[in-house]
Regions:
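Catalytic cores of DNA base-excision repair glycosylases
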Residues: 24-242, 248
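Polybasic, lysine-enriched low-complexity intrinsically disordered terminal tails
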Residues: 1-23, 233-253
Length: 253
């Protein structure tokens, strides 16, 4: 397969994401317009995880790996009504936490990490969530993506947490192509202009979750379809015509 066809192979019949040479990347003006349109539709994008403070956000994001935000929110609703600080989580204990989050995948490991990171926050950070990447990544169960989410959402940092949705959007649209999650993150950091840098993570993840879907992107209602490199665009679903039933004609008496 030629280099050109390989980069254009992400079609409705072939959903594997391929990675771009420089010609696939959107131009600077198109990137600005891409974000401008997303911002116009959603001026104040927010995470869909429910939380009340930076600590609860950290717990929610830690619990969200391989789980949906909806599932995490259901599990943490009662938990966050009871637990608002690391000290309260430590007091709740491992088994108490497990009882709250047992509906979430991998809840045993997640519970262990949450208790462990809570103990460290109490011991080393006066019960506060640090706004520093290195300090966050030193916590059990906290990787680069989780640290980026917390820094961006809780502290307004210009960080770009790349999950499966943003990885797909970055490569499919050409806004930030890259072969790895880190490559996409670096491309976003390099190419995302002001005033969109703080909101970029939320705009892109919501775009990937609800419009630029993995199996069938909804190009027919996409606000940036004309800027996107994805070809051919998916057509709107066909509307089945309703069958009108009539009463059978009765024979004349």
């Amino acid at each position: 397969r030629s280099g050109k066809s390989r980069y254009l192979a992400d079609t409705p019949k072939s959903r594997s994401v391929h990675y771009a040479r420089s010609a696939w990347s959107l131009k600077k003006a198109d990137i600005f317009e891409f974000y401008r349109r997303l911002a116009e539709e959603n001026p104040a994008p927010e995470t869909e995880l429910a939380y009340g403070n930076a600590y609860q956000l950290l717990v929610a994001v830690t619990c969200s790996a391989q789980s949906t935000d909806v599932g995490v929110n259901k599990a943490t609703k009662a938990l966050f009504a009871e637990v608002k600080t690391p000290a309260q989580m430590v007091a709740l204990g491992l088994e108490g936490l497990k009882a709250h989050i047992k509906t979430i995948g991998l809840f045993n490991n997640k519970a262990k990490n949450v208790i462990a990171l809570s103990e460290i926050l109490v011991r080393d950070h006066a019960g506060e969530v640090p706004a520093d990447r290195d300090a966050l990544e030193a916590l059990p169960g906290v990787g680069r993506k989780t640290a980026n989410v917390v820094m961006n959402t809780a502290f307004g940092a210009e960080t770009f947490a790349v999950d499966t949705h943003i990885f797909r959007v970055g490569n499919r649209t050409g806004i930030a192509p890259g072969k790895t999650v880190l490559a996409v993150e670096k491309a976003l950091d390099k190419k995302t202009p002001q005033p969109f840098r703080v909101g970029a993570h939320h705009w892109l993840i919501l775009h990937g979750r609800y419009i630029c879907k993995a199996r069938t992107p909804e190009c027919w209602r996409c606000p940036v379809a004309d800027l996107c490199r994805f070809k051919p665009k998916t057509a709107p679903p066909k509307i089945k015509s309703a069958t009108v039933q009539t009463d059978p004609v009765k024979p004349a008496a």
